[in-house]
Amino acid sequence: MTLFKRQWFVLVSAVSAALSVVLFPLEVFSASPNSVGGGVQQMNILQAIVLGFVQGMTEFLPISSTAHLKVVPVALGWGDPGVAFTAIIQLGSIAAVLWYFWGDLTRIIKGATRAIALKDYADYDLRLSLGIILGTIPIVFFGLLIKKLIPDFDSSPIRSLGAIAVASIVMSLLLGVGEKLGKRERDFEHLTMQDGLLMGLAQALALIPGVSRSGSTLTSGLFMGLQRETAARFSFLLGIPAITLAGLVELKDVFAEGIADGAALPLIVGVISAAIFSYMAIAGLLSFLKTQSTWVFIWYRLVFGIAILGAISAGILQNS
C-alpha cells in the first residue's frame, strides 16, 4: 500500500469510526445517564471509553469535538454529558499534545528565555512565544465574558443540535474557501506574532459549539497563506493554553460542587481514552496534511451538519 493510500485510509477510517458511533447505536449503550454535581453526567466505563474516543479523534481534527460529544451521546440515548465533562476529558487531549510537542515546547521556552536574557527581541522563539500568548487572550477574554453574561450556557439554545449543525455547515464552507483560495506559501519558520493574534481571534469562535477550535484556526491559517501542516501544527501549540485553562476551570467547579459516588472512575477512564486517541489524531493529521488537502474534512462537516438537520426534521433527534 502506498504512503498516500495509507494516510488516506487512516484518516478516513478514523472519521468513519466516529461517524459509525452516531449512526449505529447499540443496545448495550442505551442506558440514560443521571446528572452529577458540576454538570457532569454519571456513566459507565464503556460509555466513558467511547466518549474519550470521540473526544480524542475529533479534538484535533477540524470537525468539532464539542459537536460530536453533544451529538453522539444524544443519538445513543445517553443525554448531553455537559460542558463540564467535555472540558474535563479535554485534559486527556492536552496531555497528548504536550507529549507529542514536548521537544518543540522545551526548545521554544528555552529559546524565548535566552532571548529575553540577551534582550534579543527579534529572536524567532521569543516571537513565536509571544504569538501564542497573544493568540490565547481572545478566547480567554470571550470565555470569561460568556461565563459572566450567560451563566446557564450549558443549556442555552446555542448548544442545541440545530445550532451545532448550522455551525458545522458554515465552517465547512469557510474551510472550503480557505482551501481553494489559500496560497500555502509560508512554513513554520515564517510565522509572526500577527499570525498568532489573528489565529487567536479565529480560535475564540470555537466558543460557539460546532465551530471547532482546530477547524477555525486551520481555516484562518489557510486564509493567511500558511501551509496546511504549518497551520495545523501552530493550531495545536496555540490550543495548549486554551484547552488547559478550560479544563482546569471546569475541574475546579466540579470539585467545588462535589462528584457523586461512582463518577470519578469513568471520568479518569474518559481522560485516558481521550489522551490515547488524541495522540493518534495529532500524528495522523500532521502526516496527512503534508501531502493531502482538507477536502475530506470539508465534505464530512457538510454531510454531518446536513444529517443532523435531517434527523431533527424527521423526528429522529430532538433539537435539544
Swiss-Prot record:
Topology relative to the membrane: Multi-pass membrane protein
GO MF terms held by the record: undecaprenyl-diphosphatase activity
Highest taxon in the source lineage: Bacteria
UniProt xrefs under Pfam families: BacA
Record keywords, A-Z: Antibiotic resistance, Cell inner membrane, Cell membrane, Cell shape, Cell wall biogenesis/degradation, Hydrolase, Membrane, Peptidoglycan synthesis, Transmembrane, Transmembrane helix
GO biological process, one term: regulation of cell shape
The protein's enzyme class: hydrolase
GO cellular component: plasma membrane
Catalytic activity: di-trans,octa-cis-undecaprenyl diphosphate + H2O = di-trans,octa-cis-undecaprenyl phosphate + phosphate + H(+)
Additional remark text: Bacitracin is thought to be involved in the inhibition of peptidoglycan synthesis by sequestering undecaprenyl diphosphate, thereby reducing the pool of lipid carrier available.
NCBIfam families: PRK00281.2-5, undec_PP_bacA
Name of this chain's protein: Undecaprenyl-diphosphatase
Source organism (scientific name): Trichormus variabilis (strain ATCC 29413 / PCC 7937)
